[in-house]
């Protein structure tokens, strides 16, 4: 048995058919012409985490238990994020899988075939005992255990935190050509209260065309208006403990001293929670295809909505996310001999959120 599934989140068949008639999607049209083409029934509600879980399990939302982005805790009526349920144990609060239903990935391995799930929604945290190889998609938190917002830092005092979801910060000038700031990291208990760990960074503006971001042990050359490569952000939690996240940075405007960081995301090789399985697979993918963003919603719609980045910068980020997933998929495809290999591309959904309708 050899099955390959390529999922496109928010793919509207009616729009596809209109573009197909105009001969604007020749490759997808060829797939439809060579095989069979059918419309799928839409889940109710028609939400990404509901639809993909129904597709993976063959169950309706009432059976698999995911029926909205927000659920109600029946014990106290508080609202909670359905994709990030937690449980308390002797080791503290831990994330637990958002559903317990059997998927076709599980069925494949029960039947003796390997199965790989790439960026499928509602697959975080990884089930470490499961033989299904997986990289999680929608529902993967940032290193704070939240859905994730970025950090925007500026010399200006005109920005008001109340008007932004993104975390605001101040850049301090040290001489004519140097700015310093801090990134907020995970929290730790101190004196009975949560205190967030901070990491310092600096911007060397000696060359206006290529400012240098100094953070941790890295010196990253920036080009105003362009995204940096993915880099690591270290946080010191205590004498013997530390944590690392990953992010990308951009100086959105060429003529201003402002910098924006994507949400601080899980480093897949140093995750505080079970991120992906098996460890050998994620390590090989990371080292052979290059770093990739790990947040469940990596296309930063918030910063675009708030006017921190512009349309072109957002779309460039989206294209680069697609390219990184393609590299991992093609690497897995090269090794694929039998079983199930599935991947979900969700950038189409994020672009429609911002530009369609």
Task: Go through each PLM region and give its residues.
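Short polar catalytic/cofactor-binding loops
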Residues: 8-12
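Extreme N-terminal starter segment of soluble prokaryotic enzymes
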Residues: 1-4
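Second-shell loop/turn segments in exported
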Residues: 14-15, 94
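His/Asp/Glu-rich, glycine-adjacent segments
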Residues: 59-357
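Short, structured active-site-proximal loop/turn typified by the sulfatase FGly-forming signature C/S-X-P-X-R
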Residues: 17-64, 116
